[in-house]
Amino acid sequence: MDFKRRQGPGPGVPPKRARGGLWDEDEPSQFEENLALLEEIEAENRLQEAEEELQLPPQGPAGGQFSTADIDPRWKRPALCALDPNTEPLIFQQLEIDHYVGSAVPLPGGPPTSCNSVPILRAFGVTDEGFSVCCHIHGFAPYFYTPAPPGFGAEHLSDLQRELSTAISRDQRGGKELSGPAVLAIELCSRESMFGYHGHGPSPFLRITLALPRLVAPARRLLEQGIRVPGLGTPSFAPYEANVDFEIRFMVDADIVGCNWLELPAGKYVWRTEKKATQCQLEVDVLWSDVISHPPEGQWQRIAPLRVLSFDIECAGRKGIFPEPERDPVIQICSLGLRWGEPEPFLRLALTLRPCAPILGAKVQSYEREEDLLQAWPNFILAMDPDVITGYNIQNFDLPYLISRAQTLKVDRFPFLGRVTGLRSNIRDSSFQSRQVGRRDSKVVSMVGRVQMDMLQVLLREHKLRSYTLNAVSFHFLGEQKEDVQHSIITDLQNGNEQTRRRLAVYCLRDAFLPLRLLERLMVLVNNVEMARVTGVPLGYLLSRGQQVKVVSQLLRQAMRQGLLMPVVKTEGGEDYTGATVIEPLKGYYDVPIATLDFSSLYPSIMMAHNLCYTTLLRPGAAQKLGLKPDEFIKTPTGDEFVKSSVRKGLLPQILENLLSARKRAKAELAQETDPLRRQVLDGRQLALKVSANSVYGFTGAEVGKLPCLEISQSVTGFGRQMIEKTKQLVESKYTLENGYNANAKVVYGDTDSVMCRFGVSSVAEAMSLGREAANWVSSHFPSPIRLEFEKVYFPYLLISKKRYAGLLFSSQPDTHDRMDCKGLEAVRRDNCPLVANLVTSSLRRILVDRDPDGAVAHAKDVISDLLCNRIDISQLVITKELTRAAADYAGKQAHVELAERMRKRDPGSAPSLGDRVPYVIIGAAKGVAAYMKSEDPLFVLEHSLPIDTQYYLGQQLAKPLLRIFEPILGEGRAESVLLRGDHTRCKTVLTSKVGGLLAFTKRRNCCIGCRSVINHQGAVCEFCQPRESELYQKEVSHLNALEERFSRLWTQCQRCQGSLHEDVICTSRDCPIFYMRKKVRKDLEDQERLLQRFGPPGPEAW
């Protein structure tokens, strides 16, 4: 539903801390250490509580109102075939991996069981036949490393193990008592830190293995504080890989990547037929060392027939108040099921409160009691057993509302929505904050064994749109509109009859269907599966974690093969570095072809070419101390030093080479593949590989990260700046008249990884030829794999300023342009009203496509005239901005923030909340009133006939974008005088407000319709216009007819959109321009009818 409270994505992240190098001399303050200690203790307690909860006695749903007879056999998973664990292997695609604490199980070839609690990993997945699987993986214990202190030998191992185990047990008092030793083993081994090149090879490290994952944090903390070792005093131990999640640690060691296929060999696993812990069809136990992991290549790239469920709910709210689960009932829950790979949903189900008329193609199940309705849905979930659950804003509205409502009504068996028997789905609050998105509060609902893909959260994270309502995104990506029912109307439909409830159910089913369409169209599931495979993390991590865990996983895998360890780095310092180079643009309108040359994967290529990595970094002065020859290391443009690959090949360059070569193979396979499902997988894979390669550089420069390294990130951008400058110099020195070319080439602009070159030729074909030649020639001057490629030609080309340009793009065919490309202009920005984007786009189209600058000027003047004369529809004037912080947290007053506060006072339930985009228009007010005081809700403006501040829109919204476009064509001084002054700006229309101001103290008097003079009676005309009364009446009737015809057209269009030509239009979609037009015309009709009533009833002579 579009009225749901929308809040932003993501789990909470710690407050930002500044970045610093590994070798900073300053020690952290005691206060910072205490804060870190508190944070770790809280994390331990949360993990401990979660593990304890997992051990609660089963209470799963029993009975319920959704009987077996109500279930279509096609909804269920296929019946389980006989499986012999001794002769048949079990092969399945895992979707989610987590862990819990339980009792050990006797397994073939496994160690003897004990009464102590042990960590058990749990992999949920699906077989090729569609059977659901839960695999309990035993025998893997958490561990981390620390350098052995000087003088430490094998004789000290038992003493350290005893001291550390005692210290951890003492530290855990007050919590759950440990049933056995905290430290299982401490071993001596040879490893090397990945941070910096030391030249001495491996050194002694201690591998500390613990009983439970939650003991890693206290063990690390106690070791950092110092542990007594007989004969060595109380040395402090620096932790390595102690901040790695238990699941990631297991997947790295077992060589398992996200969503890959696992094989359990025959005779190595035990099938649980009794005492099952989950609702899965197949539940097995196996040793972690017996699990075979298949790399996602060839036949193992396929995706199992996953079952995807999309759902939506409707609530009956009170008038003007947003639904609250403590008071407002759930009246409908609609669900659609899809088997991945099939074209159509196999399941359409509407659960309704009170009888509902049948719906073609869907099963309708009605209930008289809300408690029965609520119990039926989890029972249906249990029967259908979905692998993936999707919807629109289910994370922040649907799921929390259902769970809270069931709790209010004491439907105790409702919140068992996951696959683990007896484990409740709980709600917890989460907060995410960053410079890019500000602060977003959200909720997280646990549903173990099922992957949640909230399409609103996906779109917020991956796409920048003006509006994120389901209607807006459906129109943007699918080209489809939908009926949008206001929450206050939903109650009226519910209280109507079977047909009105049917209409509500159809609306609800469509709201469940559209997220499925979006999931398929945007390839969200496929892309995330492939990203999980490429980066090696569980699928759930991609949806709830940040970017860094993806690089950490790849880094750990590569490091393990070479005996390298990742240190735990405390980020302290606060340095910054210079970003990429932008060559100063030569602004203007170019009516000649401009060739664009682009560095392919610039930052990854730089890191590979120059061997930039943690493992190759030299400390200041280290090159001399280690006796390195000048040809064995490089000095970067920023003064940092790294050894060359001949001395040591860096980890990051190896990771990048693997990613880019895998992408090349995936693209080659994609070009040959004909099967549409396989093409989707390959396309998702090559995209995941590209994104992963580009994110490695960002990982090294992250302010608060697992392993920040300023030396790498600043060196990369330093080389990038140097290469752009060198490319400019090479192009302009070769392509000259002296060297036999038609003209002297000129680089008109360069930005980060691309340069725009004017070769002085007149045809696109010649520019393409010279562009390819120049790309190959320049590439020969840079080390491999750095490569400059010809990308496209712009003709014509409008260069406005840095990061702002537009042109017709030719990439392959010199005779036909691909599209009109705009960067940084209001045509593609979302922080202006649609009028700006539409006017900029239409003006650019006239300039670039039609080659008619004069026509563009005339069109812009016409639009400005329409604006000043109040002929622009209000939907074109709506500005939307995101509410990223509370009002008190903004440094200055903001228009959308102030409006949100006013709307909260009018109606707290429907007011925008954090993470929402707030639509508003600027209305007219007294001179000197600040713009933030003039923001108002568009619907409120229409209902109360508030005047629009057209001068604001002309001066603050249209003026600068138009001048940016037309100044290169008309000249800086002339553009302003032609566009913003002149006859077209002299005629203005101002509406009279019906509320506020001095109108509260004035008495309204009628005016003559003919001459506008004040009259003292209720009639339509004065005595001087009386002879023309018939003529004036006919004129107003004609105006009324025109309004009625316009309203009928708009009404019919809305009826077609809602799918019924015989029902009232109740849609209130604020993202649809038709809605505002319909509201405006309806109001104009009412005013016109009142005006005609002033003429009085027709006299006898009219008959």
From Swiss-Prot:
Gene Ontology terms: cellular component: delta DNA polymerase complex
Region span, Disordered: 1-29
Keyword field: 4Fe-4S, DNA damage, DNA excision, DNA repair, DNA replication, DNA-binding, DNA-directed DNA polymerase, Exonuclease, Hydrolase, Iron, Iron-sulfur, Isopeptide bond, Metal-binding, Methylation, Nuclease, Nucleotidyltransferase, Nucleus, Transferase, Ubl conjugation, Zinc, Zinc-finger
Crosslink position(s): Glycyl lysine isopeptide (Lys-Gly) (interchain with G-Cter in SUMO2): K570
Location of the motif CysB motif: 1054-1072
Any Pfam family hit: DNA_pol_B_exo1
Record GO terms (molecular function): 3'-5'-DNA exonuclease activity; 4 iron, 4 sulfur cluster binding; chromatin binding; damaged DNA binding; DNA-directed DNA polymerase activity; nucleotide binding; zinc ion binding
Ligand binding ([4Fe-4S] cluster): C1054, C1057, C1067, C1072
E.C. number: 2.7.7.7, 3.1.11.-
Nuclear localization signal (motif): residue ranges: 4-19
S-S bonds: none
Gene3D superfamilies in alphabetical order: 6.10.140.1540, DNA polymerase family B, C-terminal domain, DNA Polymerase, chain B, domain 1, Helix hairpin bin, Palm domain of DNA polymerase, Ribonuclease H-like superfamily/Ribonuclease H
UniProt cofactor(s): [4Fe-4S] cluster
Main location: nucleus
Location relative to the cell: Nucleus
Residue positions where Omega-N-methylarginine is found in the record: R19
Family listed: Belongs to the DNA polymerase type-B family.
PANTHER family referenced in this protein's UniProt entry, alphabetically: DNA POLYMERASE CATALYTIC SUBUNIT (PTHR10322), DNA POLYMERASE DELTA CATALYTIC SUBUNIT (PTHR10322:SF23)
Name of the protein this chain belongs to: DNA polymerase delta catalytic subunit
Gene responsible for this protein: POLD1
